[in-house]
């Protein structure tokens, strides 16, 4: 009986690890997998063309340096927080405020259902850290992109940049737009 309980415990722990939100790439259809591509052009030349572009920190930094104001949304389709807002709403608010909007998805889950008009869908190029594009990869990606750690900048999904310089990380996109 004890061996059975140990085996059941191991199986349940393994199941949790397997189902923990990661890339979810293996759950994409073959057509969707073909639409996940390495970004080979400047980010500001991309359009919302149904593809997910895998980007590096260097590509993102070059993009940020070329813009006056940028709001990056660290998008997670599985997020249930009141602060996880439909990207189309944020895109509209950014357009009104004259702020460049950028989506960086931390998972492929639901990424092809994002409805935005003009914003290309970006994801972290998973091989840059030798890890999958899960929680740890996004944390390291944004640590390097902001020049801070999540402990010092606080946890938020919205990153504000002015002329390539990180200004803050916010829970609420409206604060990221106003800088308050």
Describe each region flagged by the PLM.
Residues 17-66:
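N-terminal "domain-start" segment that seeds a small globular fold
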Residues 1-4:
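Positively charged n-region of N-terminal signal peptides that target proteins for export
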Residues 76-82, 108-110, 129, 166:
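Short acidic, S/G/P-rich loop/turn micro-motifs used as interaction or catalytic elements
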Residues 61-90:
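Short active-site neighborhood of thiol/selenol oxidoreductases, capturing the structured segment around
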Residues 94, 100-138:
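Conserved segment of the thioredoxin-like fold in thiol-based oxidoreductases
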Residues 62-67, 95-96, 151-152:
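Flexible, charged surface loops at secondary-structure boundaries
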Residues 131-180:
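Thiol/disulfide oxidoreductase modules built on the thioredoxin-like
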Residues 12-15:
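C-terminal motif of bacterial Sec signal peptides marking the signal peptidase cleavage site
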């Amino acid at each position: 009986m004890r061996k059975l309980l140990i085996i059941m415990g191991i199986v349940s722990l393994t199941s949790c690890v397997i189902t923990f939100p990661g890339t979810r790439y293996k759950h994409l259809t073959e057509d969707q997998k073909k639409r996940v591509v390495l970004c080979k052009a400047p980010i500001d030349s991309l359009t919302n063309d149904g593809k997910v572009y895998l980007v590096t920190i260097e590509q993102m930094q070059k993009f940020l340096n070329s813009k006056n104001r940028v709001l990056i949304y660290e998008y997670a389709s599985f997020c249930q927080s009141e602060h996880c807002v439909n990207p189309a709403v944020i895109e509209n608010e950014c357009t009104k405020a004259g702020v460049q909007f950028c989506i960086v998805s931390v998972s492929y889950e639901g990424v092809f259902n994002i409805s935005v008009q003009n914003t290309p869908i970006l994801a972290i190029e998973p091989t840059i850290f030798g890890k999958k594009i899960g929680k740890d990869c996004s944390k390291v990606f944004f640590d390097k992109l902001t020049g801070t750690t999540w402990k010092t900048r606080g946890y938020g999904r919205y990153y504000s940049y002015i002329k390539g310089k990180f200004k803050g990380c916010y829970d609420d996109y409206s604060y990221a737009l106003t800088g308050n």
